Every structure is written in C-alpha cells, then in structure tokens.
Amino acid sequence: LPALPEPVPDQAPSSSPAHGRLSLLVLYTDRLEECRAFYSALGLSFAKEKHGDGPEHHAAVLADGTVVELYPVLSAPTGPVRLGLEVDGRRATPPLPPGRHVVTDPDGRKVEVRAHGAQAADTPAGNGGA
C-alpha cells in the first residue's frame, strides 16, 4: 500500500462524519438464526426485516448508528470479512470481562470483540461467567 501523507497540524483527522465512518455492514450466511443468536449474545439487538421482494433478514443498530444486517445466502457466497465490535461486556452472554476477545461466529468468521463495562466478577450471580 502507498504511504499516506502525514496530516497537516491544522488539518488533523477528526471523528466527524465529514471524514467518513462505517454506516452499514452486511453479513451473508446460510446459518441465519445461529448467527443472530451469536451476535445477540454479544449484546446486539436485532429486528426482523423484509424490504419489498427481498429476503427476510435481521438488522441491528449500534450505538454510533452503524447498521449490522444478517442476510441469508441466496447465491454465491461473498468473500471473507474481518469484523470488530465494541460491546458492553456486562450484556454479553456469558458476560465478558473488559478487554479484547477473539471469538468465532457460526460461519467461522473471527470476530474481535472489545468489551467494556464492569469486570465479570462484578456482575450479579446467575448471569453466567467462568
């Protein structure tokens, strides 16, 4: 890859939408319900959707407005994808302690999860854990 130019001090990158941000991620799977359960266990809240003649699928809106959709594979599968999520570890099932975790979804995709929130030991008894 070519080297990127160094930012000019008064034009430093910002997190403003004018500089772009991910707004949609679609994962195609032949294990739709398994993937929905997997990502739901990480704290994503999915709604079932159908647009026109398209297939039923699941959609979740992340805290920053990014939409994550799970679609059934209807033709040739798409290429691999690297996925990273930031979640409240207390809402995961089982709860995840703060930090970086790498998990595998039902389609074999490696998912990097950065959990924040209370330590797993700080979660109420009966909510899972090691």
What are these regions (language model features)?
Residues L1-A18, R21-D30, E49, H58-A59, T66, Y71, V73-A130:
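Vicinal oxygen chelate
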Residues S16-G20, V26-V68:
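Core segments of cupin and vicinal oxygen chelate
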Residues L32, D53, S75-A76, A118:
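Short strand-connecting beta-turns/loops that link adjacent beta-strands
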Residues C35, E86, V113-R114:
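General helical structural elements
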Residues F46-A47, G79-R82, D122-P124:
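A short, polar/proline- and glycine-enriched secondary-structure boundary/capping micro-motif
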